[in-house]
Amino acid sequence: MNRRALLAAASVAGGAAAAMAVLGALAPIAAAGPRPRLPPMAGRRVLVLGAGMAGLVCALELHRVGAEVSVLEADTRIGGRSLTLRGGDIVREDGAAQTVAFDRDPGLYFNAGPARIPHHHQGLLGYCRELGVPLQVLVNDNRAALANGVPLSQIRASMRGLVAELATKALGAGLLDAPVSEADMLRLRAMLRNFGALDREGRFRGSPRAGWVEPPGVAPGTPRPPLPLAVFADPALWMAADFAEGVNYAATMLAPEGGMVRIVAALAAALPPGTIRLGDPVLDVLPAEGRVRLAGGEERADIVICTLPAPLAARLPGLSVARRAALSGVTQEPAAKLAVQAPRFWEAAGIYGGISWLPEADITQLWYPSGGFHAPQGVLTLAYIWDTPRGLRFAARSPAERAAAALAEAATLHPELPAVARHPVSVAWGRMPWARGAWAEGSAVPPFLSEPEGRVHFAGDWLSALPGWQEGAVASAWHALSAIR
């Protein structure tokens, strides 16, 4: 099957969303590219607007070549959307504030923004290596997790078995569009038997790959039965089972020990004290003069690097009319997350890390912690929402209403959860005042937005082929730095 046929089949089966998921899985890996070789910049002053990933990468690379760097951050913390929440932290959305009530334990934290790093995101991983950020494996795909209450192991085994059985029948009916020798036909049949765990007659009658109704011990055990073909008319099941085939979701996935904020903290620690100024929002930028207006005055620089999210950069009146219009057209996805602290009851069911799916529910996904196994308590990401209507619906609720709705939906997978879950905390990124959304995926970003305007350069994950990924922020930072002369 060629690429076009595969996309067409996905579109018929699951609509445009499925076709886009397949397209993402087939797309080439967008790497950060080579790190720019900057000229010596002693005596030159640079203002970096924003202390998220892109801003901190720019600041560190400029500091390394001798520039005098100041980072101006509107928020009271660094990191932007790289946000790790622990007990005592405060989340401030428009019109609501939440104090995180998790127990003060090093293993109890919630990555409310990015939570995973693909193994091929070598720009970001390079900084982890250089700066000594310890990493752990993140369990992204777990066969013991569930989709609509069905174990992913059972779904995957049934998918493979049914597809292999259908393909074997096609071979027997001579439906291949190219001649195949008898020897190759035997090899193809053997491959399909192995792929789908077929019997000698080419039939799928079940397999231990599906997991167990009764696990083996002294007795041999009873595998879960095959799922009927009609089950797979629902694309939610097979997409949940196969999402980790996408290049950005395949093992090995990684995460910093102790939370994603460890990376931005390491970048900030590598800068001279006083480089980063918090609580200092930018009101305007004058590109021709390198002037930046703040609530408390004005700053001048030889170079300004703006790493603000597009909706915030669009508010800067000194930028050109064309740029501001284009920035206003970059729509941010209103993704959201919610987490709770709970006893690790899921481990008693054999679930150690990974993601369960409720594709038709608002919460969409549940993420189980990938570390601290067998500890008394864990932080369960009870909702990860990226669909726009669901994200807007979630954001419109109060934190208490979000938690009640999420627990009710999650109880269809884990009935014990409402009785044991504590300390819910949620982040709706569209309501975070210094983000105004999670990523710009789906938006048409005009290429000229990544080009400098006067003395002002621009960076951010939304200006890369990897919006929503920290590697995209690194790539865009390197691109902006490469234009400095």
Give the location of each predicted region.
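Short glycine/proline-rich turn/loop motifs
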Residues: 38-40, 101-109, 241-252, 383-393, ...
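Conserved beta-strand->loop/alpha-helix structural units within folded catalytic cores of enzymes
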Residues: 45-75, 116-121, 127, 133, ...
